[in-house]
């Protein structure tokens, strides 16, 4: 589907959403998602580009605590499986993505629905379900910053990135999916979201667009 004046991304008013790129979902983690570790260098490149440009970054994470988790996860957690447990090493964001590797997640604040500031224009946000927009302050945060374009990358496309893309579309955001910085993408899955007006781009194209975009949001 060709992009037009309504769907073409505005990189000068964009935010990077990094979805669920946490230690437990990497190759040596408690619940590895195939391909996520392999995508990590590209995700890191995106984060460093947005950070250097002073543009907004939202690290979106899961924390499985108690019963407030997806139904499909509840049996495993009830039976003692520990995945992205609050306060655990596995719940931490992949170290290469953080501005300071000594920063630890404030699980209590995040589970209460608050954003955790980890850098200039850079926050961490917990989401209780697949979509980064469901029961979160994400939409308000982006609107307050003047963002109209979301750039999506991270872990396990068929679940959380895809749900986030659908909800972003319903809220009239322009959307970029960074296809080589998102795990578990297949040609069919990519075709499905492109039909929604999503712009699929490789990392280096996004990097170039950010480098040539007008001044960052203040």
Residue positions per predicted region:
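Active-site alpha/beta core segments
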Residues: 41-145
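Short amphipathic alpha-helices and their capping/turn segments at secondary-structure boundaries
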Residues: 2-15, 44-52
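Short glycine-enriched, charge-decorated loop/helix-capping segments at active-site entrances
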Residues: 29-36, 82
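Active-site-proximal loop->helix
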Residues: 184-199
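A short glycine-rich beta-strand->turn/loop micro-motif centered on a GG-aromatic cluster
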Residues: 150-158, 172-187
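Short Gly/Thr/Asp-enriched flexible loops that form oxyanion-binding sites at enzyme active sites
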Residues: 161-171
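A charged, well-structured terminal subsegment
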Residues: 199-218
């Amino acid at each position: 589907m060709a992009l037009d004046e309504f769907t073409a991304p505005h990189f000068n008013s964009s935010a990077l959403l990094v979805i669920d790129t946490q230690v437990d979902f990497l190759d040596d983690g408690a619940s590895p998602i195939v391909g996520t570790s392999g995508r990590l260098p590209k995700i890191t490149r995106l984060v460093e580009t947005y950070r250097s440009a002073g543009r907004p970054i939202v690290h979106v994470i899961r924390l499985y605590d108690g019963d407030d988790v997806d139904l499909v996860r509840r049996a495993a957690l009830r039976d003692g499986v520990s995945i992205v447990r609050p306060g655990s090493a596995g719940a931490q964001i992949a170290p290469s993505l953080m501005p300071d590797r000594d920063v630890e997640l404030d699980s209590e604040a995040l589970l209460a629905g608050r954003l955790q500031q980890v850098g200039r224009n850079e926050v961490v946000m917990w989401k209780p379900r697949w979509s980064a927009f469901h029961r979160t302050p994400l939409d308000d945060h982006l609107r307050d910053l003047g963002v109209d374009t979301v750039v999506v990358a991270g872990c396990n496309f068929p679940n959380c990135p895809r749900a986030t893309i659908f909800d972003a579309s319903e809220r009239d955001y322009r959307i970029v999916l960074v296809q080589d910085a998102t795990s578990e993408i297949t040609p069919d899955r990519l075709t499905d979201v492109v039909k929604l007006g999503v712009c699929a781009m490789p990392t280096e194209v996004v990097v170039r667009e950010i480098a040539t975009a007008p001044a960052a949001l203040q």
